[in-house]
């Protein structure tokens, strides 16, 4: 709960090299909303939420994300296409340019923090060029009580200047936009892009280094909820697999929908204070929690509005990546504070468009590590190109773009924690059944919810299982509320020989993707691989 006492504190930005700026410190959501409209940077939708257009960039730009290579990072970061090194001197020069750019401007400053567990709290100061970016920071990070602001000292600084354009030839960037992490100076420097997700994912990436390296805590790209008995469930999954949908359960309290830590004390905590949900094709019937959260204080990004300010959630004219951010207290059924104990069940969600993987299966520790490192889902190709074949997509740890360390480091931490806590790990296919995309149909959400509920309630502990002939996964033969023929995907295909061929094809994709990890993976992990 944020108190409403008047904030009288003021701050100077001179120490950051930002001279003569007009500083707007810790403005309320209402003030930031009104300033955005007054500046012509957004409009109010019929629900009272602020609607903005983020400009040229409507999503993250992973090829323009850098980490400063220095004494802290050079031997720890897994350098490559995901973690691209940046020169220390170039960083200092670029930082000074951004600071100079923000001089004489209105700058919106916010003190906030990440990590709902006080032991792991990371204080953040966010400096924004635009008021709506600062409202995003209010929504997404945890909000300190006003009395905490008097002695607030940031651990990390986020400097965010969407209007600043880098000169790639001079500044060492790839193009005019950039998001750079400096672990020695503890700065996230973001410029040339108005996409607010860069702010959120900048701090997430920082925590994905800081927590495992210094705190023996596993950072996870997952959602989490907790039952009445205090049992925590964790849902890993890439975009579009159902993380947000499936963790919103009327019988369980939401801890968070995207970023969490699993501590050495075997507790779970949310990194964030808000949610950043996709709203493409959103309906009140399918996603009531998100739909109702779109109210004053929320920010809609890149959506289409009609003359009355009503949102057309099916309109993808600007982007398919339409979003809403809101503080977590816009949702009713939440855990306060956003922490949990004793993880009992972990779900790896995948939308398998090949129609091969079972709707639910139980994993051994080796299989769990293998599938965690693989991070598989499938993308359905765009119809404009006339391509109907699904495309496999692998993202290590279900969040490769945000993981500075080698994926096997996170996988080994997860394995140790799973064994110590005796956790059940389930692979859940929210994708296709009865054939691949174009032939089969999407798994019914009703069935997926039934299977997850059965797993959470322990109803799958005493049923018979059968082993998948290629992936070696243990598939329950029965599950309450789900037709038994659905549980073995091979039985849902008219042509079972075609199924076997498709399963081998998918198995080959898995094995090919995993080659780059083989030299780092132990025997137990390699035993979790599908057969050739």
Curated annotation (Swiss-Prot):
Binds 1 Mn(2+) ion per subunit. One of its GO terms (biological process) is gluconeogenesis. It holds the Pfam family PEPCK_ATP. Transmembrane segments: none annotated. GO terms for cellular component: cytosol. Keywords: ATP-binding, Cytoplasm, Decarboxylase, Gluconeogenesis, Lyase, Manganese, Metal-binding, Nucleotide-binding. Its cofactor is Mn(2+). Mn(2+) binds at residues 201, 221, 258. Pathway: Carbohydrate biosynthesis; gluconeogenesis. Substrate binds at residues 60, 195, 201, 323. ATP binds at residues 201, 221, 237-245, 287, 323, 448. It catalyses: oxaloacetate + ATP = phosphoenolpyruvate + ADP + CO2. Its EC number is 4.1.1.49. It is found in: Cytoplasm. InterPro entries: PEP_carboxykinase_ATP, PEP_carboxykinase_C, PEP_carboxykinase_N. It is an enzyme of class 4 (lyase). GO terms for molecular function: ATP binding; metal ion binding; phosphoenolpyruvate carboxykinase (ATP) activity. Belongs to the phosphoenolpyruvate carboxykinase (ATP) family. Involved in the gluconeogenesis. Catalyzes the conversion of oxaloacetate (OAA) to phosphoenolpyruvate (PEP) through direct phosphoryl transfer between the nucleoside triphosphate and OAA. PANTHER family: PHOSPHOENOLPYRUVATE CARBOXYKINASE (ATP) (PTHR30031:SF0), PHOSPHOENOLPYRUVATE CARBOXYKINASE ATP (PTHR30031). This is Phosphoenolpyruvate carboxykinase (ATP). It comes from Christiangramia forsetii (strain DSM 17595 / CGMCC 1.15422 / KT0803). The lineage of its organism: Bacteria, Pseudomonadati, Bacteroidota, Flavobacteriia, Flavobacteriales.
